[in-house]
């Protein structure tokens, strides 16, 4: 569902797929090739949200910020299932694991991996090319080239999968065509 709220309207610049059960409201910009999956909520009612090119916001993720805050997701980012991004910035090619939480003002660098279930506290900076895990999240190592390549592959795989879902035929329609 796309909706205007607080005088702000989402801008779709060519998303590959936005699920019919996703909610995209307010000051949200969807860049070309991005995908927003089932049950995801992207609320740009309090501040602007930009979803980068080929970035995927997976099922049941929530993106929102406090008044005056903003969210910027770079190109080729993966926001895992059930993750929460609240007023944060995520750099190009990074992966935020399932059920991870990013709090206000934190910055995740380029080509980073945030482990599943991690909590990145307010204002924390995760340097480029690192892996951070835990509660609170701490950097444990440099991201191996294979890990960052896999994160990039994941982003492209979700663009392609999104196109498949966008072309899907609902079962009721398929049955009536028989």
Predicted segments — roles?
Residues 1-12, 17, 45-48, 53, ...:
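Glycine-rich hexapeptide-repeat left-handed beta-helix
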Residues 25-31:
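N-terminal glycine-rich anion-binding loops that anchor highly charged ligand groups
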């Amino acid at each position: 569902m796309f909706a205007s709220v607080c005088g702000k309207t989402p801008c779709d610049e060519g998303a590959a797929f936005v699920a019919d059960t996703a909610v995209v409201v307010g000051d949200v910009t969807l860049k070309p090739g991005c995908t927003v999956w089932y049950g995801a909520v992207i609320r740009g009612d309090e501040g602007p949200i930009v979803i980068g090119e080929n970035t995927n916001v997976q099922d049941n993720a929530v993106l929102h910020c406090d008044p005056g805050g903003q969210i910027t997701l770079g190109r080729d980012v993966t926001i895992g299932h059930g993750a929460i991004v609240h007023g944060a910035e995520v750099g190009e090619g990074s992966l935020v694991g399932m059920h991870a939480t990013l709090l206000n003002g934190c910055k995740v660098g380029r080509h980073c991996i945030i482990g599943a279930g991690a909590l990145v506290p307010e204002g924390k900076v995760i340097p480029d090319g690192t892996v951070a895990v835990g509660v609170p999240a701490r950097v444990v190592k440099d991201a191996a080239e294979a890990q960052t390549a896999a994160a990039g592959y994941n982003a492209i795989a979700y663009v392609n999968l999104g196109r498949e879902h966008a072309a899907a035929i609902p079962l009721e329609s398929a049955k009536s065509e028989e």
